[in-house]
């Protein structure tokens, strides 16, 4: 079955699906400069930690391929690349995939510097190395997501002895599918894998206020792929667990991550922490799905994570397609409406931090990580190349 694509890329051209227009309109923006990528990311036309990193990396690759770098020496070429990447790094501060990708891309450009080459050849080698590294980030993300889905489905199957005759139901939050990645998704990828193996009874997705990524995007993906699913508001999760956990065999809350730090504390879309508390109270497993690029071993705990705050209007206003008097949706017309007194004070953090003690497993492309006897997550098995005491 065809899946949605948030990112379409060929060398020299990048198209990014404008997710603010979903689910009623499919429109791709051409992104050919760092400035356009910054605006695309900042305005949340593209979102999801992996997708943000991919768009930033590829937008600069398009710039370089199309000749925007006028530097003549290797040193100036690298300085130009690094300045553009530093600019893109500020587009959204909480997701660690972006900063990890930028570090990798800088390293690739520096490593391409070859002694003895004339300046034009040296510059070309640096540009080619950057473009190849950016394209590798795109290709690896899809492979990683498929592996996350496989490992996550296997872990849940083992926990609950799920079978096609006794499948699991799960709840997910925000959007972590093809629209947040290069394809398949992280947490939603686990749901896809369960569904493909006939181990999924039902998926529940939260509305995910205030930006409604669950109702606008995840619900759209689930319907698009024919996965049995129900949309609930964020505040219905407790009632869902209390009233339907046993009948629907609700076994897990599966979420993505914008940043997982060394002790396992996880920054994710606002509302994730509340779901973790509810899951623990009701005996439901709480699972984080994230590629190893989302793991930040330099930050010891969630206290060190910078939490982005968004503008008040995202909480007090909504935009959507116009509903006609007969109940039909006119996708050609949109309207922005106020849903609160515009004079009210607003606190609008984009993310919260779920403490590691509320998390049962962190599923990566290299396997599921669970806490040891000391109650701590140990990422040394999935990140031996980056782990150090």
Swiss-Prot record:
An example molecular function term from Gene Ontology annotations: S-methyl-5-thioribose-1-phosphate isomerase activity
Its biological purpose: Catalyzes the interconversion of methylthioribose-1-phosphate (MTR-1-P) into methylthioribulose-1-phosphate (MTRu-1-P).
Highest taxon of the lineage: Eukaryota
Protein name (database record): Methylthioribose-1-phosphate isomerase
Gene from which this protein is expressed: MRI1
Known catalytic reactions: 5-(methylsulfanyl)-alpha-D-ribose 1-phosphate = 5-(methylsulfanyl)-D-ribulose 1-phosphate
Keyword entries, A-Z: Amino-acid biosynthesis, Cytoplasm, Isomerase, Methionine biosynthesis, Nucleus
Principal location: cytoplasm
Organism annotation: Chaetomium globosum (strain ATCC 6205 / CBS 148.51 / DSM 1962 / NBRC 6347 / NRRL 1970)
GO annotation terms (biological process): L-methionine salvage from methylthioadenosine
NCBIfam families to which the protein is assigned, alphabetical: eIF-2B_rel (TIGR00524), PRK05720.1 (NF004326), salvage_mtnA (TIGR00512)
Gene Ontology cellular component terms for the protein in this record: cytoplasm; nucleus
Pathway per the UniProt entry: Amino-acid biosynthesis; L-methionine biosynthesis via salvage pathway; L-methionine from S-methyl-5-thio-alpha-D-ribose 1-phosphate: step 1/6
EC number(s) per entry: 5.3.1.23
Family matches, as Gene3D superfamilies: translation initiation factor eif-2b, domain 1, Translation initiation factor eif-2b, domain 2
